[in-house]
Amino acid sequence: VAAAGACVAATAAGLPKIEVLATGGTIAGSGASATGSAYQAGKVSVNHLVAAVPQLADIAEITPKQVVQIGSQDMTDDVWLKLNKTINEDCRKFDGFVITHGTDTMEETAYFLNLTLRCKKPVVLVGAMLPSTGLGADGPRNLYNAVLTAAEKKTAEQGVVIAMDN
């Protein structure tokens, strides 16, 4: 995926435009201790998540948007509909979409969007196993790889996808 995404950025007239839609989850989790296991999901803003990965600016033009800040166990039809509406309305403005999401219901969100989106651009869901404040947090690398995946036009041929764990 990294090679494909780098190729997109290198050969395009400009960097691909990717909208990062944040819903919360562990990837946006915050805890009192970097080594502790207790944390609250969905506490870190999308602006902070994007700022934590400055390398994103080398591969895409990022537009962050906070949709909700919840743990994915609290995902609802209303949030799914809001994601659907946002992507369909923003489809002409962006080359792809990344949705940061908790892992509890990530596959349900991907399935719903795959069935209902009219937009035929890449849509990539991404999450993490460790909160953003955790030692060795996997969210930054996962977010980077998700943006690479969303920047690749051929990703759209696969429907809505999930990119995690390198």
Task: Report residues per predicted region.
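Hydrophobic h-region of N-terminal signal peptides that target proteins for export
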Residues: A2-A12
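Active-site histidine-anchored catalytic micro-motif
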Residues: A10-N166
